Amino acid sequence: MAFTSIVTVNYNQPEATLALLASIKLNLNSDDLEIIIVDNGSLTDCGARFKQCMPQIIYIRSEANLGFAGGNNLGIKAASGEYILMVNNDTEVVKGITDVLIQEMEANPEIGIVTPLILYFDQPDTIQYAGYTPMNYTTCRNKTEGLMEKNAGQYAGISKETAYCHGAAMMCRKADIMNIGLMPEVYFLYYEELDWCEMFKKAGKKIWFSGKTHIFHKESISVGRESALKTYFVTRNRILFIRRNASLVNQIIFGFYFTCVAIPKQIIIYILKKRTDLIPYLRRALTWNITQAKDSLKLGFNTVA
């Protein structure tokens, strides 16, 4: 089987990263792999702990938090594998996952990125991802296929094109990345893998879902807590994604929808939830998109922990 690089990014979650390494050690043949851990500006340098678990890992430490894309890009640049599997550090792999995903890609050279079935770690009979529907460019909304369905084998063996991959687990060819480009770092977090998929599709590649294997993701089924950081980047990047990928007509329609419907609705929700402290971050996200170019690396938010 082709040599594969597994890339994961750690940010102040050493225990999760160690659990991922343990699952790799248990379930995958290390002779065909290189494991790259990028520490994304964590408060504590845990490289020695990671190497104690798997001495052969390649450990890269960034003094700054470069975001989801920036951290993964550091790992991609260091990778020597023909194939690269990027996984969140809060995932755990199963036997043969790399072999199955490589087989999918080798069977169809048009595949640019493939993501497996994703199951919730704490409720392994529940599906988190089985593909994405296409984006509605007038609202910047789409749906996750399979979300919250009980896993009764309904996606087992299914191999199909989908609109977008899932950032928790993505395999692609190193050669394709070198041709198409690294993950866009303008987002910092949220929407970057969707934009990357758009880049691959514009280059003639397909985004793929495979139900022939799966991965467990420790992201909670419950909705994550609202925060200033989440409010700002979700809002900012939703607009930015449309600016970077939609036609001018759709950008105009989206602009009216977002300012006249989506933002007022969100303000009402925050008022009802007694989270009026988050409303200024909606305004800040809008202001950033008005004042910054769509390829600006200025985040507009202090991300230092």
Regions found by a protein language model. Give the residues of each.
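Short aromatic/hydrophobic "clamp" motif used to bind/position activated sugar donors
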Residues: 84
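Glycine-rich, basic loop-to-helix element that forms the pyrophosphate-binding segment
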Residues: 61-79, 89-91, 100
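Acidic/His-rich active-site region of diverse nucleotide-sugar glycosyltransferases
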Residues: 70, 92, 99-181, 186
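Non-catalytic, C-terminal membrane-associated alpha-helical segments of glycosyltransferases
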Residues: 229-234, 248-305
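Catalytic donor-sugar/metal-binding loop of nucleotide-sugar-dependent glycosyltransferases
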Residues: 178-189, 194-216
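Short beta-strand/loop segment that forms part of the nucleotide-sugar
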Residues: 32-41, 60-62
